[in-house]
Regions:
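Short secondary-structure junctions
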Residues: 26-28, 173-176, 302-305
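Short, structured coil segments at secondary-structure junctions
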Residues: 23, 109, 256-257
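Conserved mixed alpha/beta catalytic, RNA-binding, or beta-rich assembly cores of soluble enzyme
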Residues: 12-18, 34-36, 44-46, 50, ...
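Donor nucleotide-activated moiety binding/catalytic core segment of transferases
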Residues: 41
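A short beta-strand-loop structural module common to alpha/beta enzyme folds
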Residues: 25-35
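N-terminal basic/disordered segments at the start of proteins
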Residues: 1-26, 305, 312, 319, ...
């Protein structure tokens, strides 16, 4: 988590520096040769994962108001008074982690964390906090309220998962029966009207002809996801053979999706563990019988879940990093 602290007084600056000593981040003082409030808020709202104001809540609210979008993208915002008595999360308490951050900041300076979200106030399972702890994307943030409201009303919520979840489920959270509708689902392949939580564990293996354009890769990727019902947000990285390390179309495709891309030699790919879809043609060109599956496995350190799909000179395969979810949803 990248953090940015802003203070307004000498006393506040001393507290911000103390907090940053324990929870590192940039520290600025508004005015006195430092940044202006509006400029600082605009820059840090776009850059940082968390903004920490040491000052009045009203100042922080006015500073961030022009930049707030929605709970899926807004950073965590926490305000502490300059004496360090209270730590108040005011934005992105669950998905952004502001509630947990407020507790952590409070522990550093002896403040009282002032947590106002209903699930936390009532000691009820917060599905969006759980998703963040399990490194999952929330596909439909608007459906969070439905799950939380049901738990707050005392009713059970039902879930489905493609992965075994360690530990005991929180109170009120029960597995959905075969014929029952799930309220939320831990899945790579969303379907229906449940709240879908997507583990960010996928690595996309890529093979392509020389000169393949970004547009061709995008079209093939859309077909790949549609054919399998795959949530593309599960993918966090890509991999291919080193022969493609300077392909402009492939590099731009990965950059546009925000994926780091790892390239491997034919010898490295040949030593990838597992069974792969062989191609004599691919071997004749690259020196190894399969690029996309082998590259995905090496980069993920896991196994193939979607084998090679080929079309229009592009091949994709998906491997998963090891993933062991549990029912932890609060920081210890």
């Amino acid at each position: 988590m990248t953090r940015a602290y802003l203070a307004f007084t000498e006393k506040g600056l001393a507290l911000a520096q103390k907090l940053a000593g324990a929870l590192p981040g940039t520290v600025d003082r508004c005015g006195h040769g430092g940044p202006g409030l509006a400029d600082w808020a605009a820059e840090q709202f776009a850059r940082a994962d968390a903004l920490i104001f040491v000052g009045a809540v009203g100042i922080a609210v006015r500073a961030i108001a022009p930049h707030c979008q929605n709970k899926a993208v807004d950073p965590a915002v926490v305000v502490l008074d300059e004496c360090g008595h209270f730590a108040v999360p005011i934005l992105s308490g669950h998905l952004g982690g502001a509630n947990d951050l407020a507790r952590a900041l409070a522990a550093v300076c002896g403040a009282v964390p002032v947590i106002t979200t209903a699930t936390d106030a009532n000691g009820v399972f917060a599905v969006d906090t759980w998703a963040r702890h399990q490194n999952c994307a929330v596909l439909e943030p608007g459906r969070i309220k439905r799950v939380s409201s049901r738990l707050l009303a005392g009713g059970p919520v039902r879930y489905r998962s493609e992965f075994p979840i360690a530990g005991q489920a929180p109170a009120g959270v029960v597995p959905a029966g075969e014929a029952e509708r799930a309220d939320f689902a831990l899945t790579l392949f969303p379907a229906g009207d449940a709240l879908h939580l997507i583990p960010k564990i996928g690595v996309l293996g890529i093979g392509c002809r020389r000169g393949t354009s970004t547009a061709q890769l995008e079209a093939a990727f859309a077909q790949f996801c549609a054919a399998h019902g795959l949530a593309a947000v599960c993918i966090t990285a890509a991999a291919s053979i080193d022969l493609k390390a300077h392909e402009p179309g492939l590099l731009e495709f990965c950059r546009a999706h925000g994926w780091p891309v790892q390239f491997y030699s034919a010898a490295q790919l040949q030593n990838a563990p597992g069974q792969f879809t062989p191609s004599a043609f691919v071997r004749s060109v690259t020196g190894v019988d399969n690029v996309c599956e082998r590259a995905a496995v090496l980069a993920a350190g896991g196994t193939i879940i979607l084998p090679k799909q080929a079309g229009n000179g592009v091949t994709f395969a998906l491997a998963l990093r090891p993933f062991a979810p549990d029912w932890r949803w609060q920081d210890a």
